[in-house]
Amino acid sequence: MFALVDCNNFFVSCERVFRPDLEGKAVVVLSNNDGCVVSRSNESKAMGIKMGTPFFKVRHMVDEGRLTAFSSNYSLYGDLSGRVMSILADAVPHIEIYSIDEAFLHLDGIDPENVQEFCRSLVARVRQWVGIPVSIGVAPTKTLAKIASHFAKTHKGYRGVCMMDTDAKRLKALELTPIDDVWGVGRRLAPKMESWGVRSALDFVQRPKEWVQSRLGVNGLRTWEELCGIPCVEEENAERRKSICTSRSFADMIEDERELELRVSDFAAMCAKKLRDEGSAAYDVTVFMYTNRFREDLSQYFPSVTIRLPVAANSTQEIVGAALRALNTIYKEGYQYKKAGVTVSNIVPQDQLQGVLFGYDQTLRKKQDRLSELMDSVNADSGKAMLRLAAQREGHYADGIRCEHRSSLYTTSLDEIMKVH
């Protein structure tokens, strides 16, 4: 059996740990640059606020005192997430951390008759020790555990734990689950499935195996089998990703090409550092930019381009250089850009690089690699980006990011620790 532990409205819950006066009140947490809503309390959901709602559309609620908004405080969220995961890791032999607010627990070795009591004790322990409310779904597969955790979160009668331990419970849950809420289906594939008459998870599992495989391939069949109670989803390999992306919305729209070069250089440098951290290198560097889609009075432009490197790289110089070449090909004057980003993909292990025989300077590559290692070492010791390329901006990466509503760094900064009088 698997248990999916999901922190309820995680970012909002983190803020409430240090603001208990906000319990029962409408709260939202905003994305970078205070752009849009990325976490909502149940009260703000009841007010009709949707995920991704631009902040300017709900700012009047803040001004009227009906809503409290926080800028993202990732240092706080990351620290509290680590505390939650530490409690879970101490409770079971094996844990898979799926995201900042979710983890799968392997329940092997726990008496099936005691699983519900065990999970309820975990809910209480996390709440008491960290202050974060969690919901737990228990089922024979990870996909079913995801569904069970949703019921645990949305129905108070479960008291935080939903057990999907019989076939009758499984079929009832599938009947009540829309197909676009199934892990592995999502909103992109759901319309096509609905056109085939598959509107619920139960509709899906009632289709023959051959029908599923012919229309949805191996991945669709794996989801179908998971919903039938057959474990198919293997443990995620968190060590190496298919792509790495760094992007930000800008506090103020940018039109100047030089300023965009500085921002894109920062994003590319961060991607290169992430590649080195996980021992990987990438062949492809993609740059994309967006104008402000909410400004209908402005011209719109959403370009992107990918540069293929002759040899997979992870040095800051090579990744930044490719990103700037990409930017140069898509930049157009006369547009005001609200967001930009860099994605590195076609990722391979660093120790499995395939070089080219001609036309590539191996000596230069070694110099670039040594320089990147030196930058990483100095910056790690100093705790900030003391060494950077001339193409990058001066100062911290976060400089210029709007965060007018950020809470204190209660757990990670002695200067901002909560004071008791």
Regions found by a protein language model. Give the residues of each.
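A generic structural signal for short beta-strands and their flanking turns/coil linkers
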Residues: 23-25, 132, 281-283, 303-305, ...
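Short, well-ordered secondary-structure micro-motifs
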Residues: 146-148, 297-299, 353-355
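C-terminal hydrophobic structural anchor segments
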Residues: 324-381
